[in-house]
Amino acid sequence: MIERKNHEGYADPTAYAALTRVIRQNRFAYICSPYRDNPRVNVMRARHYWKFTVSKGRIPIAPHLYFPQFMSEEMERERVMQMNFELLKLCGELWVFGDKITKGMEAEIAHAVRLRKKIRYFTTKFEEVL
C-alpha cells in the first residue's frame, strides 16, 4: 500500500501520485497455466507463453518454471502456492493460458480476483478469449 504521507507524517501528494502511476503501469504479467498433469509438456508450453508475453511488452512471471527446479510440487504444494501468491501480488495482470482450468489455476485466479488484478484469458494458440 502506498502511503499518502511522508516519513514525518506530512501529506506528500506528489510522491503518492508518482508511485500510484508507476504501480498502474506495472508491466509484470503472472502466467497461469497447467503444470501438474504433465510437467514436461506444460513447461514447454509455459516457455512459449513467456515468449508471447514478452512479445506483448510484458515481463512474464511463471512460478511453475522456477520452483520445480528446487522444490517438490507434491511434497511442498501449500508452500509453493503461498510463494506463487506473493509473486502474484507484484504483477499488474494475471494471464491465463490453456483450454482447461486446473485446481491450482483456480486458486491463482481466485487470489487474483481478491487482489483486484486484471485477468486475461488466452487459448493455447495465443488467441485472447473475451
Feature map (PLM): residue ranges:
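Catalytic phosphate/metal-binding cores of nucleic-acid and nucleotide-processing enzymes, i.e., regions
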Residues: M1-L130
